[in-house]
Amino acid sequence: MATIIINKENFYHNLNQIALKTGSVEKIAIVLKDNAYGHGLQLMASLSAEFGIRHAVVRSMEEAKNIKELFRTVLVLGDHAVKDDICSFALNCLNDIENAELGARVELKVDTGMHRNGIAPEELERALQMIQKKDLELVGVMTHFRSADEMGSELFWQQKQFASVKERVKEAGFMNVRFHSHNSAATLRSKTFDEDLVRVGIGAYGYNELPDVFDDIPLKPVLSLSAKKIATRRLKKGERVGYGGDFTAPEEMTVSTYDLGYGDGWCRGDSAHPYITAEGLPILGRVSMDFIILESAKEELVIMNDAQKAARQFGTISYEMTTALSINIERKIVDR
C-alpha cells in the first residue's frame, strides 16, 4: 500500500510560526478532527504534546478517547455532552444544553454570522440561564469565522459581534471562561491577538489559504504521499492503458502500476486532464480503485508533497486532499 510521510521538522516549524503570532504555545489548540486532517490522529497528537501543546480539538468523543491523556483540555465539537475531567463539549444550539449530562464541561458556540452552528446572539442570555439551571460547567465561549481566508471586511464585522458577546457573558457573571474565535486564517492575518486560544488546523499542517497579500507567514507542508511499484511492462506505440483505454502510448514506452487508487482516498479526477505528480509525471489513463499507472520503473514515487498544489489540479482545496486519505495507509514520521 501507499505510504504517508509526516515531516516532524516542518510541523514544529509551523507551530513555532503560529506561536509567534499568539505570543505563547500555551494559547494554541491543535485541531485533530477527522484523523488530524488525514495526517493521523494519534501520531499528530503525540507530536503536538511533545512540542508543548496543551489543548486539542476533535470531532467526536471517540476521537477524544484516543488522545485525551496527552492534553490538559480537549474540546469535542460534535458529540453529546457528558461529564469528563478533560473533555469539554461544544453547545451548538439550545437543545444541546437540554440534552447535556448534568455537570458536563461545556463551551457555548455563538453564531456571529456564519449561520452554520451556534446559538443566535439574541439567545445568549437564555442560554446562559439554561446552563446555570442545568448545573453545567461553562469553560468556554466561541464562534467561527466564515470568510477569514478571503479579502473583505466580514472578518472584522464578526469580530465586532463576538466582542459584544464577550462583554455580555462577563456581565452575566461568567468570569472564568475562555474565549476563542480564531481559526488558522484569522490567526495568520491578525496583527494582534487578545483571546485565550486559537484553534489551529490547516495552518499547523502547512497550508496558508489566504490571498497572496497576506502570504508572509512561511509555512511548510507536513504530509507527503508516496506509492510503491507493483509491476512494470513495455508498451508498444498505439497500445492503450487501463479502464476504457483512455491513454494511448504515443511511442514505445515503459510504464508501471503503483499501489494507490481512489480506494485509498486519492481523487479519481479526469483522465483527459491528468494529475501531474510531485516528480513531474502525469498519471496515465484512469485512476483505478487500487492502482495508478505512470511512465516510470522506479520502485517508489512521490505522488504528492504539497496538498495545496495538488488541490489546484483537481479544482478543490488542500483540506479535501488530505482528509480523504484512507486511515489504512501507513503513516511514518521523519525528522526532516
Swiss-Prot record:
Its EC number is 5.1.1.1. Its cofactor is pyridoxal 5'-phosphate. Gene3D superfamilies: Alanine racemase (3.20.20.10), Lyase, Ornithine Decarboxylase, Chain A, domain 1 (2.40.37.10). One of its GO terms (biological process) is D-alanine biosynthetic process. The active site is at 33 (proton acceptor), 243 (proton acceptor). GO terms for cellular component: cytosol. Keywords: Isomerase, Pyridoxal phosphate. The keyword Isomerase applies. Pathway: Amino-acid biosynthesis; D-alanine biosynthesis; D-alanine from L-alanine: step 1/1. The keyword Cell division does not apply. SUPFAM superfamilies: Alanine racemase C-terminal domain-like, PLP-binding barrel. It catalyses: L-alanine = D-alanine. It comes from the Bacteria. One of its GO terms (molecular function) is pyridoxal phosphate binding. The modification N6-(pyridoxal phosphate)lysine is found at residue 33. Substrate binds at residues 116, 289. Belongs to the alanine racemase family. Catalyzes the interconversion of L-alanine and D-alanine. May also act on other amino acids. NCBIfam families: alr, PRK00053.2-2. This is Alanine racemase. It comes from Sulfurovum sp. (strain NBC37-1). The gene is alr.
